[in-house]
Swiss-Prot record:
CC annotations in GO: cytosol
Subcellular location: Cytoplasm
Protein name: Triosephosphate isomerase
Location of the active site: 95 (electrophile), 167 (proton acceptor)
Record-linked CDD domains: TIM
A single MF term (Gene Ontology): triose-phosphate isomerase activity
Biochemical pathway: Carbohydrate biosynthesis; gluconeogenesis; Carbohydrate degradation; glycolysis; D-glyceraldehyde 3-phosphate from glycerone phosphate: step 1/1
């Protein structure tokens, strides 16, 4: 049985004070929670501080992006070896904000996936359609294309131990969310798409939902059979709000 994963993406938010305060709150809120893996991805500048603050807890450290190069003349970038060295485990790639604001292509994101696997890190591959694509009935074809960029270059075995986060772009930070039934349908499509290559890998892969996940909709989302947790944005910046989502995932998957 798949173990749910709830991960907080802090995006461009944080300060030295906020990192300590939020992690202290998370440790208190989640101290007795079992049955759900938890990770947070602070901005790169605070990863070392966050790692120290997380010491001795069950909360894993993640990061929001990675470069395709391991070292060299690449000003401003962060490499997979650096993230591994500092203790990060789950690395978000392909977030729609990176795809949109930094013009990252499916092929470029597949290179990031490859470098993370080579370094023994866990890729959290974000996929999802825009509102325009959704209205045009292209949700499945867009998700398939984004997955195939990895499948066609690395093979299905690369998805062993990886994470996919389905984040409909129209639901990120908008307050809109896919209904549980809508989200489940896409998650099932994603799993079935990978199962065409390898059913066993498809069954073990964690597929998170992301896009305005909050305390009100978390329990119903997690009750769906193919939704294995969440990639949480805004709600991950408040310990109590994030904890409610983690507890909902743990409870739903134990049921």
């Amino acid at each position: 049985m798949r173990h749910p994963l709830v991960m907080g993406n802090w995006k461009l938010n944080g300060s030295t004070h906020m990192v300590n305060e939020l992690i202290t709150g998370l440790r208190q809120e989640l101290s007795s929670v079992t049955g759900c893996d938890v990770a947070i991805a602070p901005p790169a500048l605070y990863l070392s501080q966050a790692k120290q603050a997380l010491a001795g807890s069950r909360i894993a450290l993640g990061a929001q992006d990675v470069d395709v190069n391991l070292s060299g003349a690449f000003t401003g970038e962060t490499s997979a070896t650096m993230l591994k060295d500092i203790g990060a485990e789950y690395i978000i790639i392909g977030h729609s904000e990176r795809r949109t604001y930094h013009q990252e292509s499916d092929e470029f994101i597949a290179k990031k996936f490859a470098i993370l696997k080579q370094q023994g890190l866990i890729p959290v591959l974000c996929i999802g359609e825009t509102e325009q694509e959704n209205e045009a009935g292209q949700t499945e074809s867009v998700c398939a294309r984004q997955i195939d960029a990895v499948l066609n270059t690395l093979g299905v075995a690369a998805f062993q131990g990886a994470v996919i986060a389905y984040e409909p772009v129209w639901a990120i930070g908008t307050g809109k969310s896919a209904t549980p039934a809508q989200a489940q349908a896409v998650h099932k499509f994603i799993r079935d798409h990978i199962a065409q290559k390898d059913a066993a890998i498809a069954q073990q892969i964690i597929i998170q939902y992301g896009g305005s996940v909050n305390a009100d909709n978390a329990a119903e989302l997690f009750s769906q059979p193919d939704i294995d947790g969440a990639l949480v944005g805004g709600a991950s910046l408040k310990a109590n709000a994030f904890a409610v989502i983690v507890k909902a995932a743990a409870a739903a998957k134990k049921a």
